[in-house]
Amino acid sequence: MKFVLAVHGTRGDVEPCAAVGVELRRRGHAVHMAVPPNLIEFVESAGLTGVAYGPDSDEQINTVAAFVRNLTRAQNPLNLARAVKELFVEGWAEMGTTLTTLADGADLVMTGQTYHGVAANVAEYYDIPAAALHHFPMQVNGQIAIPSIPTPATLVRATMKVSWRLYAYVSKDADRAQRRELGLPPAPAPAVRRLAERGAPEIQAYDPVFFPGLAAEWSDRRPFVGPLTMELHSEPNEELESWIAAGTPPIYFGFGSTPVQTPVQTLAMISDVCAQLGERALIYSPAANSTRIRHADHVKRVGLVNYSTILPKCRAVVHHGGAGTTAAGLRAGMPTLILWDVADQPIWAGAVQRLKVGSAKRFTNITRGSLLKELRSILAPECAARAREISTRMTRPTAAVTAAADLLEATARQTPGSTPSSSPGR
């Protein structure tokens, strides 16, 4: 069968879809990925075929971060509305053209968490099954929590409903234009509802342990498979292994694709606080910054690392709150501090706090004093014990990928508008 996996976002958004793609290819299927241009090399390094899909996601995440920072400033409401619309529909027309070409002859089209309408329209045009893969709870529910904000279930549901209506409003013109280009009639409902009515499963690529009650609230059409990762095996780093073995387990710090506005000052703060605690720090540092920043001996800077081999050798993890890093840290049984900023990061921060496996604070509000306080809290024995207990309740990587691939195969065999007769178990 031919599977087309269309996903836009950062590496953390693309990797779960690529992990399923690798498994489908292993099973003998033809797999084609549509990803941001800056991540084509990433998916091709896994042996998958990639084509450019939408704008550069590194540039886009910088734009989103700047947009969020500017929300508190007084500005023209019309300019604000225009900026929101541009963020959500940038590249829609070109993405539609790309996906229409790529999906010719496909048995299934899968979308990631954004630009659902692009994939929904293409699947409808070819009358083929569709699916979605979500790595945090996107649909309306009453189970998520945001740090420092009261979040009763009724308020959570109401807020999410408003958010979806806003998204439908800002994307309707782009959606209409794509449908006209494809010769489709005006859409009777928003894209997410159209996907649901066509029987598209919404695969939840995270563990329900993070959101107690969510699996019961949702139907079988939103099956949980667990966090998806490609389990990439980087080249052995003897220098890093030697540094880790030479002292006490370090605290890992990494902020993924989230832009750090003051990397030099941030590194100095981490170094000073860890020195005060008598801890060592292992810090992910992008190559562009690595050679320009000096640091003390108790600090080690690294590039991309294999989480499955390195994190279990650490004492705790501090990160931006991406879904993949959150899952990797807790799979390793690590107490966690999330310094969140944008997108789904506050949702994971809230989950970590609610599970009592760590703490959370907005990145822009962190100071030496508050970082010291938060690290002391997650290094407490009871927090570490709770993190180890939660790790035993998480789905293993191979089981998660297998379940997701099984679901996509079953969906591809269905007539659009029906649902798979059964879902694979966890």
Curated annotation (Swiss-Prot):
CDD domains: GT1_Gtf-like. InterPro entries: EryCIII-like_C, Glycosyltransferase_28, GlycoTrans_28_N, UDP_glucos_trans. SUPFAM superfamilies: UDP-Glycosyltransferase/glycogen phosphorylase. It comes from the Bacteria. One of its GO terms (molecular function) is UDP-glycosyltransferase activity. It holds the Pfam family EryCIII-like_C. GO terms for biological process: carbohydrate metabolic process; lipid glycosylation; vancomycin biosynthetic process. To M.leprae L518_C2_147 and M.tuberculosis Rv1524. PANTHER family: STEROL 3-BETA-GLUCOSYLTRANSFERASE, STEROL 3-BETA-GLUCOSYLTRANSFERASE UGT80A2. This is Uncharacterized protein MT1577. It comes from Mycobacterium tuberculosis (strain CDC 1551 / Oshkosh). The lineage of its organism: Bacteria, Bacillati, Actinomycetota, Actinomycetes, Mycobacteriales.
